[in-house]
Each structure stands twice: as structure tokens, then as C-alpha cells.
Amino acid sequence: MTNDTDTMPIADYLAQGGKLTSPENVPPRYRGELLRLMSSFVDSELAGSAGFAGAINWAPGIKARIAASRITLEKADHAERVLDLMEGFGTDKALYERAHDWAAREGRDSTLEAKRHGGDMRLSVFHYPLTGWTDAVVMNVLMGLATQHAVGELARCSYQPLAEVLRDILPREKRHMELGLEGLERIGATDEARASVAYWMPRVAETFGPAVSERFEKQRAMGLRHTDNETLRSAWRAEAESVLSPLGLC
């Protein structure tokens, strides 16, 4: 389905659940918000992949090494799929990939607000470094659960090509979380695991954004978002606690 500006204003069309299907029929303000969402996803996947690459050599066995390698590879692939969509809006893909040091991190004890830092659009959680295998596994589980909610939200967006790509990506992102959970079950309720949960829970929670957000309201009016930040965060927190509690980690 495409917009038909001859029959109704684009804002009304989107408010009624209309879908846009190509860069050519996207109005300027919509384009800006859409590119912001896509850039945040691409940058977060690239930063996540680059940061998790180091975990491959921390893996305690062959299966764990394969799992870490798979996560690293597929997150980069997910970034490329959405970056391919951005090319249609004039983004120089080759230049974009080289624009930032995706493995760069701040200090472990840095205090970062949820807003963007540096030149890229990664979520703030991807500015913090991993310290070892247990820490990487805990972060992967918590962020993997968050991704199910956040990307699941965007998979319903009004820009149909992005929604379709994200629906294809979601099962693999879920599998990444499941691989992490398998690793966490093997690690068990150690002091190190509990410390990592305490460290990452508030930082992952911040990725959903402020409880009251003018940007969310703007994106909801465009059909790019549907569920508010606090509702998504609460759903994630409840699911995270249900996963961690049987393991003695919350």
C-alpha cells in the first residue's frame, strides 16, 4: 500500500495506519525521523558487533566460540541490511562504514546520559566496554531481550521496507539472546555474574529513552512508533527478571 496524496493529506494517511514504500514518496520531516531511527539501529549493530568480537577469544570452549562468532557476524549483517535501505536516501554506504571507530568505548565507570555521544548514533550502552566472558554473556542476554522489544516495535513501523527487514532480523536477534542464555545457565549464580547484572541492568534500561518524549510523540504521529518508551522498558524489565530469577541472578 502506498500513500495517495491526491485523496488525503499524508499526515492523515499515516495516522490511519498507511504505509510508505519507497524514498520517493517520503516527505522531508518523515525522512529525517526515519533516517534517525535507521542510523541508530545501524550504528548500534556495528558497535555491538565490534565490541562482541573480543569475546570470541574469551569463550571457554568451541561451542561458545562459535556462538560468539555467529553473533558478531550476524550483527554486522543486520547493520548492512538496514544500511542498504539508507543508500536509497543518498547515504554513501562505503563512507558510512568507515566513518567511526565502532570498537571505541568509554571508561567502564563513565557516567553517560542516554543521549548520543561522539559522532555516531549508537545507543549509549554500546559506549561501555566488556570485561570478560561472563560480562559479555550477561550484557548479551539483557541487551538481547531489550532488542526483542525495541526492534519488535520498529518492525511495525510505517516505512514498509524497514519493517520487512526488521521482521526478518528479529528471529536471529532472538537466537543471539538464547545463545547468551545458554551460556549464562552454564555460568550460574556466581558473584561475577551478579555484579555484571547489577552493572548492565540500568544501562540497558536507559536504551529505551526518557519516559516522556516529544520525539516519540512525533514518531507516533508518523506511524514510525506505536508503544511509548516506558511501556517498552517495563515489559523488558519484567521479562529480564523472569529470565534471571530462576538462575538466582535477581
Which residues make up each language-model segment?
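Acidic, low-complexity proline/glycine-rich segments
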Residues: 1-21, 43, 100-118, 235-246
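Extended, helix-rich structural scaffolds rather than catalytic motifs
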Residues: 19-20, 192-250
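Alpha-helical bundle segments that constitute or directly flank the non-heme di-iron/ferroxidase center
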Residues: 27-59, 126-157, 233-239
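Conserved alpha-helical segments that form or flank metal/cofactor-binding pockets of metalloenzymes
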Residues: 2-10, 71-112, 180-185
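Inter-helical turn/loop segments and adjacent helix faces that build the functional surface
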Residues: 54-66, 149-168, 182-195, 215, ...
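Acidic/His metal-coordination segments adjacent to aromatic residues that form catalytic metal sites
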Residues: 19-39, 101-139, 206-227
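Alpha-helical membrane segments in multi-pass integral membrane proteins
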Residues: 141, 145, 165-177, 200-201
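Alpha-helical scaffold segments that form or flank carboxylate-/histidine-based iron centers
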Residues: 30-41, 60-78, 132-136, 161-174
